[in-house]
Swiss-Prot record:
Belongs to the PTH family. It comes from Erythrobacter litoralis (strain HTCC2594). Its main location: cytoplasm. Disulfide bonds: none annotated. This is Peptidyl-tRNA hydrolase.
Length: 189
């Protein structure tokens, strides 16, 4: 079993924020792969399903971004999993908008949701970094991260999220390179 956690803030007023792109990714994966209905569990919302032959628990922590690790840690301990069995989808300022990078381990790079996750489960989990771009000046970062995607970005957002969902089987199989490569090819078309 694997846990795939999407980071974001709960509630409708945050739904389209760039900071919630991890939640959006989980929603698309659940829809595209026919996951079970949402249940309230582990201080958040979960959906169970299969991607290929792998059982996956999608988790959207309800603890707000800065405490995301509490929910992820609780789910990981309940299922007696290791950090290597956890994948976290989140927004990344240091990547161009709609670019995807996968990495394992490392620090938080200023991301409070990742910092919380590290605090609760350690560093050795897989991260799906979803680019939101940097607004240019550090004074504009908070407004950018906590701002909605612009109308002009909606098509690119939908295309990127669809690519994540369509290529999720490579993640489930542990083929991170193929996941990134196939997403890049889809987004070029």
């Amino acid at each position: 079993m694997q846990i795939w956690a999407g980071l974001g803030n709960p509630g409708p007023k945050y739904a389209l924020h760039r900071h919630n792109v991890g939640f959006m990714a989980c929603d698309v994966i659940a829809e595209m792969h026919g996951f079970e209905p949402v249940q309230k569990k582990f201080q958040g919302w979960v959906q169970e399903g299969r991607i290929g032959s792998e059982k996956v628990l999608l988790l959207k922590p309800g603890t707000f971004m800065n405490e995301s690790g509490r929910a992820i840690g609780e789910a990981m301990r309940f299922y007696k999993l290791e950090p290597q069995d956890v994948t976290v989808f989140y927004d990344e300022l240091d990547l161009e908008p709609f670019k995807i990078k996968v990495k394992r381990g490392g620090g938080a790079a200023g991301h409070n949701g990742i910092r919380s996750t590290i605090r609760h489960i350690g560093e050795d989990f897989r991260r799906i970094r979803i680019g939101i771009g940097h607004p240019g000046h550090k004074d504009r970062v908070t407004g950018h991260v906590l701002g909605n995607y612009a109308k002009a970005e909606q098509d690119d957002l939908v295309q990127m999220l669809g690519a994540i969902g369509a290529e999720a089987e490579w993640l489930a199989k542990g083929d991170d390179a193929r996941f990134m490569s196939d997403i890049a090819l889809r987004l070029q078309a």
